[in-house]
From Swiss-Prot:
It catalyses: S-adenosyl-L-methionine + H(+) = S-adenosyl 3-(methylsulfanyl)propylamine + CO2. Is synthesized initially as an inactive proenzyme. Formation of the active enzyme involves a self-maturation process in which the active site pyruvoyl group is generated from an internal serine residue via an autocatalytic post-translational modification. Two non-identical subunits are generated from the proenzyme in this reaction, and the pyruvate is formed at the N-terminus of the alpha chain, which is derived from the carboxyl end of the proenzyme. Pfam families: AdoMet_dc (PF02675). The modification Pyruvic acid (Ser) is found at S112. Catalyzes the decarboxylation of S-adenosylmethionine to S-adenosylmethioninamine (dcAdoMet), the propylamine donor required for the synthesis of the polyamines spermine and spermidine from the diamine putrescine. Belongs to the prokaryotic AdoMetDC family. Type 2 subfamily. This is S-adenosylmethionine decarboxylase proenzyme. Heterooctamer of four alpha and four beta chains arranged as a tetramer of alpha/beta heterodimers. Binds 1 pyruvoyl group covalently per subunit.
Length: 264
């Protein structure tokens, strides 16, 4: 897509929001409480602040203010208000390709924010526990927050990821013509590295005419030991391993497809 010569500031708002899920099986009530405490500590407000601050560095944003809070009995929230950095928009790469991990990318932001909220969850029946983190990166300016997607998914290793990207508002060129998007995009997947895409099953649901792009991701490899908390697979009978595997698989399928499915 050719570069637009704009009249004034780029007023497009680009928002990336995604949910990441971590699934776990616990055998006892104590193990369930232990998992919730463990995951709550792993993703406390301080660690989330570090991740989001690095995200700001990747997209080149200035941190104006940080609000963070851990909750009782569990959960955490972090919101960072960021501002623009004065750069020449002609120097910004808007092509579709994966963003960097620790390297810096310039951005042009105004009244933008990055926020995350966590939701540990469990139920006394079945032994399943889930951890969900909701993340939103919203920017006004010349680049897409999708540049931070690669880094964030690498940092928050997950079993299931649902991603929504949308562009809202419009900007005008020097002739007064409105432009409702200023970069090419066919799929959110184009902003992910090949190694990441190889790890997940992916499905797109895009509404191109509305500038809405949706991608779902489900981890391909299933190793039971990675889903057990304080339980060794070798200590379980073959029948018990199959029962737990079926339980976990069914839970992940329901979350991935976003609906209740019949138990086979």
């Amino acid at each position: 897509m050719h570069k637009l010569k704009l009249h004034g500031f780029n007023n497009l708002t680009k928002s990336l929001s995604f949910c990441i899920y971590d699934i776990c099986y616990t055998k006892t009530a104590d193990d369930r409480d232990g998992y919730i405490a463990y995951i709550d500590e792993q993703y406390n407000a301080n660690r989330l602040t570090e991740i989001l601050t690095e995200t700001c560095s990747i997209i080149g944003a200035n941190v104006l203010n940080i609000a963070r809070q851990d909750y009782d009995p569990q959960g955490a929230s972090v919101t960072i208000l960021v501002s623009e950095e004065p750069i020449d928009p002609r120097d910004v790469d808007t092509s579709e390709h994966p963003g960097p991990l620790p390297n810096s990318v310039v951005a042009h932001l105004d009244k933008s924010h990055i926020c995350v909220h966590t939701y540990p969850e469990s139920h006394p029946e079945g032994g399943l526990c889930t951890f969900r983190a909701d993340i939103e990166v919203s920017t006004c300016g010349v680049i897409s927050p999708l540049k931070a997607l690669n880094y964030l998914i690498h940092q928050l290793e997950s079993d299931i990821v649902t991603i929504d990207y949308r562009v809202r508002g419009f900007t005008r060129d020097i002739n007064g013509v409105k432009h409702f998007i200023d970069h090419q995009i066919n799929s959110v997947q184009n902003f992910m590295s090949e190694d990441m895409k190889s790890l997940y099953h992916m499905m797109d649901v895009n509404v191109y005419q509305e500038n809405i792009f949706h991608t779902k991701m489900l981890l391909k490899d299933f190793d039971l030991k990675h889903y057990l908390f304080n339980v060794n697979p070798e200590e379980l009978s073959a029948a018990e391993r199959k029962r737990i595997t079926d339980l976990l698989y069914h839970e992940m399928q329901e979350i991935y497809y976003g609906r209740n499915l019949p138990v086979l």
